[in-house]
Amino acid sequence: RIEGTGVTTPDGFRASGVAAGLKGGGQLDLGLLVSDRATASALVDTPSALPSAAVIYTRTLHAGSLRGVVVNCANAATGEQGVVDARAMGETSAAAAGLPVGSLAVCSTGVIGERLPMKALTAGMDAAAAALSADGGLDFGEAIRTTDAFPKGGTFRLALPGGDVTIGAAAKGAGMIRPDMATMLAYVTTDACVLPDDLLAATRVAAAGGFNRISVDGQMSPSDTLLVLANGEGPPLEGDDLALFGDALGAICRFLAILMVKDGEGAEHAVRV
């Protein structure tokens, strides 16, 4: 683990966190993360039979070539209008950031049944795009928090025979957590050059060994998402290097998962079985 700005430490990634008025009190509450170049991407989301509007919309996108994500609070059990709002958020954010329509995932967690305040969010998305920066990873990590007591993330350097790889991470989650993911969002960025199929396979294994093994209060969420973005700025990974990258991704997901358990709402003890 090294010092860095989380998801924006790998070259080619920018992020921001702004106050759009979702939380009140001037708190950062809208996060935007983008890659400046085409990426391989992998996405694992909730197994809930009632996924949120953000998950429903993001599933319609080409999951292997996403360029980033926009993150806010609350948009589950909101019916067809919720999906319309999620689509508008994704498309408006992409346009504001100068990215192709359909290239940004949309993620939400928060109060179930409340529609997004789209007027405030539209202004917030413009502000988030204007604030995008290679130093914005920590603001992004702060903006995605809801009931979290502290931001969760880190920066990691992986020394491989084929060259060094940098990995950044940001996550949120503190309640409604059970095996098969949780009320959680997690984002991992890397400059590694990985084929989309290889990245998806590694991401699924990492989720199974980390986020799918934690529980705080035994409740499943409709919004859980793990998104991994690899922009290819670094060395290509294959063979042993690819296997070592997969091991590192798994270790990072376990690290983030343990932070979620330690930050469980009302938790006084963390137990490993």
Predicted regions located by residue number:
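Short, well-ordered amphipathic alpha-helical segments that serve as non-catalytic structural scaffolds
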Residues: 50-61, 84-97, 200-213, 247-259
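Glycine-rich, mobile lid/loop segments that gate access to catalytic sites or pores
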Residues: 84-211
